[in-house]
């Protein structure tokens, strides 16, 4: 199988790239038609592959379960198996995206796996902190030359514009791409 490079799609996109979580082939087609740069699936949604030319980013416990994908999300919180899973992904030709919730996880991921792509999530946000603020708090610790994806499933157009101004390369959402970018990528 020829894998499509998620990193290339993000880097070559105009402005901030939008990655959309879909559950089926229709969702993948709609996301592609709306201007998404990539599709996010669970490893169980492998039947999406024949219906899109966009790179597929899979969430899944084992790289083998994501064989139809082009990249796989690994959890930095899983320190015990992160390095072994990253090696297995490399053997399978899958790009690695390491999901981090805090500075400690980011430091561990950079030291032990050194991923090209880092997924910043707001899972560890304090109650008074917005998910957007949490992601933006993590961004300065991502080294230059790495691609940063923000995981904000309920992002608004204003959130996407703020993420782009801050230097985020892509945003992972669960919603309608057109509502976030309108006729194109936000101008900032």
Predicted regions and their residues:
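Active-site-adjacent beta->alpha loops and helix N-cap segments on the catalytic face
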Residues: 1-6, 41-62, 74-90, 104-108, ...
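N-terminal amphipathic alpha-helix/helix-capping segment at the start of soluble metabolic enzymes
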Residues: 1-29
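Short beta-strand/loop segments at the ligand-binding rim of alpha/beta enzyme cores
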Residues: 9-19, 49-61, 69, 87-98, ...
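Beta-stranded membrane pore/translocator domains
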Residues: 19, 27, 37-41, 97
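Glycine- and other small-residue-rich loops at beta-strand/loop junctions that grip anionic moieties
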Residues: 20-21, 59, 74-75, 98-99, ...
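Catalytic cores of alpha/beta
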Residues: 27-30, 62-72, 103-113, 144-148, ...
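Glycine-enriched alpha-helix->loop->beta-strand junction motifs that scaffold or abut catalytic
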Residues: 34-38, 52-55, 67-72, 88-96, ...
């Amino acid at each position: 199988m020829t894998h499509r490079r998620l990193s290339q799609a993000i880097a070559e996109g105009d402005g901030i790239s939008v990655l959309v979580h879909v559950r089926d082939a229709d969702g993948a087609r709609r996301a592609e038609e709306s201007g998404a740069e990539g599709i996010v699936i669970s490893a169980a949604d492998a039947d999406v592959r024949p219906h899109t030319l966009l790179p597929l980013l899979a969430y899944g416990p084992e790289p083998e379960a994501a064989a139809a994908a082009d990249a796989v999300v690994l959890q930095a919180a899983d320190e015990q198996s992160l390095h072994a899973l990253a090696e297995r992904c490399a053997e399978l030709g899958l790009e690695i995206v390491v999901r981090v919730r805090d500075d400690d996880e980011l430091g561990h991921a950079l030291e032990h796996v050194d991923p090209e792509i880092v997924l910043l999530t707001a899972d560890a946000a304090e109650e008074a902190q917005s998910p957007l603020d949490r992601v933006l708090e993590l961004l300065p610790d991502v080294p230059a030359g790495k691609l940063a994806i923000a995981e904000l499933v309920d992002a608004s157009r204003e959130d996407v514009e703020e993420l782009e101004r801050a230097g985020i390369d892509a945003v992972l959402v669960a919603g309608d791409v057109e509502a976030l970018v309108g006729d194109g990528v936000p101008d900032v």
